[in-house]
Amino acid sequence: MEIKHPATAGTLESSDIQITLSPATSGVAIQLQSSVEKQFGHQIRSVIEATLAKLGIENVAVDANDKGALDCTIKARTIAAVYRASDNKTFDWEEINAWIN
């Protein structure tokens, strides 16, 4: 998949994360805002990077605003943002379920 235009998934509610993706030309750049960044920033970035890699996304700018989201929520929001930003309307749920657990 390829990021074609900016897209957002998630909210700024407690226990959620808002992920905004934009096209980029050189790699994955993650801008993270989180009240728990010192404790969990590395883990949040790792989950986002791993999810993007599973989806084949190599060039993207990520703006993540975390409000205490669990890993499963971070994965779900990242997947939703990628599908929106790539205009992909075909979901292979069996494949996604196989690697998100």
UniProtKB/Swiss-Prot annotation:
Subcellular location: Cytoplasm
O-(phosphoribosyl dephospho-coenzyme A)serine modified-residue sites: S14
Alphabetical list of Pfam families matching this protein: ACP
Keyword field contains Cytoplasm: yes
Gene Ontology terms: cellular component: cytoplasm
Keywords: Cytoplasm, Phosphoprotein
Predominant location category: cytoplasm
Family note: Belongs to the CitD family.
Subunit description: Oligomer with a subunit composition of (alpha,beta,gamma)6.
Function of the molecule: Covalent carrier of the coenzyme of citrate lyase.
The protein, known as: Citrate lyase acyl carrier protein
Originating organism: Lacticaseibacillus paracasei (strain ATCC 334 / BCRC 17002 / CCUG 31169 / CIP 107868 / KCTC 3260 / NRRL B-441) (Lactobacillus paracasei)
The organism's taxonomic lineage, starting at the top: Bacteria, Bacillati, Bacillota, Bacilli, Lactobacillales
Gene from which the chain derives: citD
